[in-house]
Design a protein with these regions (language model features):
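PLP-dependent amino-acid enzyme catalytic core
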Residues: 1-310
Protein backbone atom coordinates (compact mmCIF):
# COMPACT_ATOMS: atom_id res chain seq x y z
CA UNK A 1 0.00 0.00 0.00
CA UNK A 2 3.00 2.32 -0.28
CA UNK A 3 2.39 5.83 -1.52
CA UNK A 4 5.44 7.18 -3.34
CA UNK A 5 6.79 10.68 -3.82
CA UNK A 6 5.89 10.25 -7.49
CA UNK A 7 2.25 9.72 -6.41
CA UNK A 8 2.43 12.91 -4.37
CA UNK A 9 4.05 14.90 -7.19
CA UNK A 10 1.26 13.73 -9.51
CA UNK A 11 -1.34 14.77 -6.95
CA UNK A 12 0.26 18.21 -6.63
CA UNK A 13 0.02 18.76 -10.37
CA UNK A 14 -3.57 17.52 -10.40
CA UNK A 15 -4.86 19.84 -7.67
CA UNK A 16 -2.67 22.88 -8.27
CA UNK A 17 -5.58 24.99 -9.47
CA UNK A 18 -7.95 23.83 -6.74
CA UNK A 19 -6.15 24.32 -3.43
CA UNK A 20 -3.98 26.94 -1.77
CA UNK A 21 -0.25 26.67 -1.34
CA UNK A 22 -0.51 27.49 2.34
CA UNK A 23 2.12 29.57 4.13
CA UNK A 24 4.98 28.05 6.10
CA UNK A 25 5.50 30.25 9.14
CA UNK A 26 9.07 29.98 10.41
CA UNK A 27 9.68 31.31 13.91
CA UNK A 28 12.25 30.93 16.65
CA UNK A 29 11.25 28.22 19.08
CA UNK A 30 11.41 30.70 21.96
CA UNK A 31 8.39 32.57 20.55
CA UNK A 32 6.28 29.66 21.77
CA UNK A 33 8.48 28.77 24.71
CA UNK A 34 10.27 25.88 22.98
CA UNK A 35 14.03 25.34 23.20
CA UNK A 36 14.82 24.62 19.56
CA UNK A 37 16.28 26.57 16.67
CA UNK A 38 13.15 26.96 14.59
CA UNK A 39 9.52 25.97 14.50
CA UNK A 40 8.01 25.57 11.06
CA UNK A 41 4.23 25.92 11.18
CA UNK A 42 2.50 24.67 8.03
CA UNK A 43 -0.72 26.68 8.15
CA UNK A 44 -3.24 24.25 6.70
CA UNK A 45 -6.00 25.88 8.71
CA UNK A 46 -5.87 28.50 5.94
CA UNK A 47 -6.57 25.86 3.29
CA UNK A 48 -9.77 25.99 1.25
CA UNK A 49 -12.60 24.35 3.22
CA UNK A 50 -10.67 25.05 6.43
CA UNK A 51 -8.38 22.02 6.60
CA UNK A 52 -5.76 19.93 4.80
CA UNK A 53 -8.55 17.52 3.83
CA UNK A 54 -9.31 19.50 0.68
CA UNK A 55 -6.07 18.30 -0.88
CA UNK A 56 -7.04 14.65 -0.77
CA UNK A 57 -10.66 15.16 -1.74
CA UNK A 58 -9.80 17.19 -4.82
CA UNK A 59 -7.16 14.63 -5.78
CA UNK A 60 -9.63 11.76 -5.45
CA UNK A 61 -12.19 13.51 -7.66
CA UNK A 62 -9.62 14.70 -10.20
CA UNK A 63 -7.99 11.26 -10.47
CA UNK A 64 -11.18 9.39 -11.29
CA UNK A 65 -14.27 9.81 -13.44
CA UNK A 66 -17.07 11.13 -11.26
CA UNK A 67 -20.34 9.49 -12.40
CA UNK A 68 -23.62 11.31 -12.81
CA UNK A 69 -24.59 10.12 -9.33
CA UNK A 70 -21.75 12.22 -7.95
CA UNK A 71 -19.79 11.42 -4.81
CA UNK A 72 -20.76 10.03 -1.43
CA UNK A 73 -18.99 10.05 1.93
CA UNK A 74 -19.69 9.39 5.59
CA UNK A 75 -18.27 12.21 7.70
CA UNK A 76 -19.54 14.78 10.13
CA UNK A 77 -16.26 16.66 10.21
CA UNK A 78 -13.58 18.20 8.04
CA UNK A 79 -13.60 15.45 5.40
CA UNK A 80 -17.29 15.94 4.71
CA UNK A 81 -16.82 19.69 4.49
CA UNK A 82 -13.89 19.22 2.10
CA UNK A 83 -15.92 16.86 -0.11
CA UNK A 84 -18.83 19.30 -0.21
CA UNK A 85 -16.47 22.16 -1.08
CA UNK A 86 -14.65 20.20 -3.80
CA UNK A 87 -17.87 18.86 -5.30
CA UNK A 88 -19.34 22.34 -5.55
CA UNK A 89 -16.15 23.64 -7.16
CA UNK A 90 -16.15 20.82 -9.71
CA UNK A 91 -19.89 20.94 -10.35
CA UNK A 92 -20.76 17.46 -9.12
CA UNK A 93 -23.37 16.17 -6.70
CA UNK A 94 -22.26 15.31 -3.17
CA UNK A 95 -24.15 13.37 -0.53
CA UNK A 96 -22.72 13.36 2.99
CA UNK A 97 -23.96 10.81 5.51
CA UNK A 98 -23.72 11.92 9.14
CA UNK A 99 -24.73 10.25 12.41
CA UNK A 100 -27.47 11.68 14.59
CA UNK A 101 -24.76 12.79 17.03
CA UNK A 102 -23.35 15.30 14.53
CA UNK A 103 -23.96 18.94 15.32
CA UNK A 104 -26.65 21.02 13.65
CA UNK A 105 -24.00 23.63 12.87
CA UNK A 106 -21.97 21.14 10.84
CA UNK A 107 -25.03 19.89 9.01
CA UNK A 108 -25.93 23.47 8.17
CA UNK A 109 -22.44 24.15 6.83
CA UNK A 110 -22.53 21.05 4.66
CA UNK A 111 -25.90 22.08 3.25
CA UNK A 112 -24.63 25.62 2.69
CA UNK A 113 -21.84 24.16 0.55
CA UNK A 114 -24.46 22.40 -1.57
CA UNK A 115 -24.24 18.85 -0.25
CA UNK A 116 -27.22 16.61 0.33
CA UNK A 117 -27.01 15.81 4.04
CA UNK A 118 -28.45 12.46 5.12
CA UNK A 119 -28.67 11.52 8.81
CA UNK A 120 -28.31 7.80 9.51
CA UNK A 121 -27.78 5.99 12.79
CA UNK A 122 -26.24 6.91 16.10
CA UNK A 123 -22.56 6.49 15.20
CA UNK A 124 -20.06 7.06 12.41
CA UNK A 125 -20.14 3.30 11.73
CA UNK A 126 -23.87 3.54 11.04
CA UNK A 127 -23.38 6.48 8.69
CA UNK A 128 -20.55 4.66 6.91
CA UNK A 129 -22.69 1.56 6.37
CA UNK A 130 -25.45 3.73 4.91
CA UNK A 131 -22.99 5.49 2.59
CA UNK A 132 -21.73 2.12 1.32
CA UNK A 133 -25.30 1.04 0.62
CA UNK A 134 -25.94 4.27 -1.29
CA UNK A 135 -22.78 3.84 -3.35
CA UNK A 136 -23.74 0.28 -4.23
CA UNK A 137 -27.22 1.39 -5.26
CA UNK A 138 -26.36 4.53 -7.24
CA UNK A 139 -22.83 3.96 -8.48
CA UNK A 140 -21.64 7.20 -6.93
CA UNK A 141 -17.90 7.62 -6.39
CA UNK A 142 -17.12 6.58 -2.83
CA UNK A 143 -14.97 9.00 -0.88
CA UNK A 144 -13.21 8.02 2.34
CA UNK A 145 -12.07 10.47 4.98
CA UNK A 146 -8.54 9.04 5.15
CA UNK A 147 -8.10 5.50 3.79
CA UNK A 148 -7.79 5.88 0.02
CA UNK A 149 -4.57 6.20 -1.97
CA UNK A 150 -5.58 9.43 -3.67
CA UNK A 151 -6.60 10.96 -0.35
CA UNK A 152 -3.25 10.10 1.26
CA UNK A 153 -1.27 11.31 -1.75
CA UNK A 154 -3.20 14.56 -1.64
CA UNK A 155 -2.32 15.02 2.02
CA UNK A 156 1.31 14.39 1.17
CA UNK A 157 1.40 17.45 -1.08
CA UNK A 158 1.66 19.69 1.97
CA UNK A 159 4.92 17.96 2.94
CA UNK A 160 6.25 18.48 -0.58
CA UNK A 161 5.48 22.18 -0.23
CA UNK A 162 7.35 22.33 3.07
CA UNK A 163 10.47 20.87 1.49
CA UNK A 164 10.25 23.20 -1.50
CA UNK A 165 9.91 26.22 0.79
CA UNK A 166 12.41 25.39 3.53
CA UNK A 167 13.99 21.97 3.11
CA UNK A 168 13.56 18.81 5.16
CA UNK A 169 12.75 19.35 8.85
CA UNK A 170 14.75 17.51 11.47
CA UNK A 171 11.50 16.44 13.11
CA UNK A 172 7.85 16.45 11.97
CA UNK A 173 5.01 16.51 14.51
CA UNK A 174 1.69 15.32 13.10
CA UNK A 175 -1.76 14.89 14.63
CA UNK A 176 -3.41 11.51 14.08
CA UNK A 177 -7.04 10.43 13.88
CA UNK A 178 -7.63 8.02 11.00
CA UNK A 179 -4.09 8.62 9.83
CA UNK A 180 -4.41 10.10 6.35
CA UNK A 181 -2.28 13.12 7.25
CA UNK A 182 0.58 11.25 8.88
CA UNK A 183 0.51 8.69 6.07
CA UNK A 184 1.06 11.47 3.55
CA UNK A 185 3.85 12.99 5.63
CA UNK A 186 5.48 9.56 5.98
CA UNK A 187 5.26 8.97 2.25
CA UNK A 188 7.17 12.18 1.57
CA UNK A 189 9.64 12.46 4.46
CA UNK A 190 10.27 8.81 5.44
CA UNK A 191 13.94 8.15 6.11
CA UNK A 192 14.79 11.85 5.99
CA UNK A 193 12.98 13.31 9.01
CA UNK A 194 12.02 11.99 12.45
CA UNK A 195 8.22 11.68 12.23
CA UNK A 196 6.25 11.59 15.47
CA UNK A 197 2.53 10.97 15.92
CA UNK A 198 0.43 13.00 18.33
CA UNK A 199 -2.90 11.66 19.56
CA UNK A 200 -5.50 12.68 22.12
CA UNK A 201 -5.33 10.31 25.07
CA UNK A 202 -9.07 9.78 24.59
CA UNK A 203 -8.75 8.82 20.90
CA UNK A 204 -5.57 6.71 20.58
CA UNK A 205 -6.03 4.93 17.25
CA UNK A 206 -2.37 4.58 16.30
CA UNK A 207 -1.11 3.93 19.83
CA UNK A 208 -3.68 1.16 20.22
CA UNK A 209 -2.65 -0.39 16.91
CA UNK A 210 1.03 -0.25 17.85
CA UNK A 211 0.21 -1.93 21.16
CA UNK A 212 -1.89 -4.66 19.56
CA UNK A 213 0.29 -5.17 16.51
CA UNK A 214 -2.61 -4.40 14.16
CA UNK A 215 -5.42 -1.84 13.77
CA UNK A 216 -8.10 -2.17 16.45
CA UNK A 217 -11.24 -0.25 17.34
CA UNK A 218 -10.98 2.27 20.16
CA UNK A 219 -13.51 4.35 22.04
CA UNK A 220 -13.33 8.00 21.05
CA UNK A 221 -14.09 11.01 23.23
CA UNK A 222 -12.61 14.30 24.30
CA UNK A 223 -11.90 17.78 23.03
CA UNK A 224 -10.49 16.76 19.64
CA UNK A 225 -13.05 14.08 18.76
CA UNK A 226 -14.73 16.32 16.18
CA UNK A 227 -11.75 16.10 13.84
CA UNK A 228 -9.72 13.20 15.28
CA UNK A 229 -12.75 11.00 15.82
CA UNK A 230 -11.88 7.89 13.82
CA UNK A 231 -12.32 4.68 15.81
CA UNK A 232 -9.54 2.81 13.99
CA UNK A 233 -6.34 3.74 12.19
CA UNK A 234 -6.62 3.37 8.42
CA UNK A 235 -4.94 0.45 6.66
CA UNK A 236 -2.78 2.72 4.49
CA UNK A 237 -1.72 4.77 7.49
CA UNK A 238 -0.94 1.62 9.47
CA UNK A 239 1.22 0.25 6.67
CA UNK A 240 3.31 3.43 6.58
CA UNK A 241 3.25 4.44 10.24
CA UNK A 242 4.41 1.13 11.68
CA UNK A 243 7.58 1.46 9.58
CA UNK A 244 8.23 5.18 9.57
CA UNK A 245 6.77 6.77 12.72
CA UNK A 246 9.42 7.03 15.42
CA UNK A 247 7.02 7.49 18.34
CA UNK A 248 3.38 8.09 19.24
CA UNK A 249 2.55 10.46 22.09
CA UNK A 250 -0.80 10.67 23.92
CA UNK A 251 -1.88 14.10 25.12
CA UNK A 252 -4.46 15.09 27.70
CA UNK A 253 -7.37 17.35 26.82
CA UNK A 254 -6.17 20.13 29.14
CA UNK A 255 -2.79 20.23 27.39
CA UNK A 256 -4.45 20.34 23.98
CA UNK A 257 -6.72 23.17 25.09
CA UNK A 258 -3.80 25.14 26.56
CA UNK A 259 -1.87 24.81 23.30
CA UNK A 260 -4.90 25.88 21.27
CA UNK A 261 -5.17 29.03 23.38
CA UNK A 262 -1.41 29.63 23.17
CA UNK A 263 -1.57 29.61 19.37
CA UNK A 264 -4.39 32.14 19.52
CA UNK A 265 -2.93 34.46 22.14
CA UNK A 266 0.67 34.13 20.96
CA UNK A 267 0.32 34.08 17.17
CA UNK A 268 -3.34 34.92 16.56
CA UNK A 269 -3.94 31.55 14.90
CA UNK A 270 -7.54 30.40 15.31
CA UNK A 271 -7.26 26.63 15.06
CA UNK A 272 -9.22 23.54 16.06
CA UNK A 273 -8.02 21.36 18.95
CA UNK A 274 -6.55 18.77 16.56
CA UNK A 275 -4.25 21.43 15.13
CA UNK A 276 -2.89 22.24 18.58
CA UNK A 277 -1.51 18.77 19.34
CA UNK A 278 1.99 19.48 17.94
CA UNK A 279 2.44 22.47 20.24
CA UNK A 280 0.90 20.57 23.15
CA UNK A 281 3.53 17.85 22.71
CA UNK A 282 6.30 20.44 22.90
CA UNK A 283 4.76 22.42 25.76
CA UNK A 284 4.34 19.32 27.93
CA UNK A 285 7.80 18.05 26.96
CA UNK A 286 6.33 14.85 25.59
CA UNK A 287 8.60 15.78 22.69
CA UNK A 288 11.96 17.39 23.53
CA UNK A 289 13.87 18.46 20.42
CA UNK A 290 17.57 19.23 20.40
CA UNK A 291 18.40 22.95 20.59
CA UNK A 292 19.64 22.96 16.99
CA UNK A 293 16.59 21.25 15.50
CA UNK A 294 14.13 22.61 12.98
CA UNK A 295 10.74 21.19 13.91
CA UNK A 296 7.69 21.02 11.62
CA UNK A 297 4.26 21.47 13.20
CA UNK A 298 1.37 20.70 10.84
CA UNK A 299 -1.46 23.06 11.80
CA UNK A 300 -4.11 20.89 10.25
CA UNK A 301 -7.44 22.72 10.47
CA UNK A 302 -9.66 25.57 11.60
CA UNK A 303 -12.87 23.80 12.58
CA UNK A 304 -13.35 26.01 15.63
CA UNK A 305 -15.84 28.46 17.07
CA UNK A 306 -13.66 31.54 17.58
CA UNK A 307 -15.83 32.58 20.52
CA UNK A 308 -14.27 29.71 22.48
CA UNK A 309 -10.81 31.27 22.12
CA UNK A 310 -11.53 34.42 24.12
Amino acid sequence: MDITRDDIDAAARRIAGDVRRTPLLRIAGRELGVDCAELWLKLEHLQVSGSFKARGMFNRMRADVVPAAGVVIASGGNAGIAVAYAARALGVRAEVFVPASSSEAKRARLAQLGAVVTVRGASYADALAASLDRQATTGALLMHAYDQREVVAGAGTLAAEVEADAGVPDRALVSVGGGGLIAGVCAWFAGRSRIEALEPALAPTLAAALGAGCPVDVDVAGIAADSLGARRIGDIAWSLARRHVAASHLLADDAIRAAQLALWHGLRLAVEPAAALPLAALATRAVVPRPDEKVLLVICGANVDVATLA
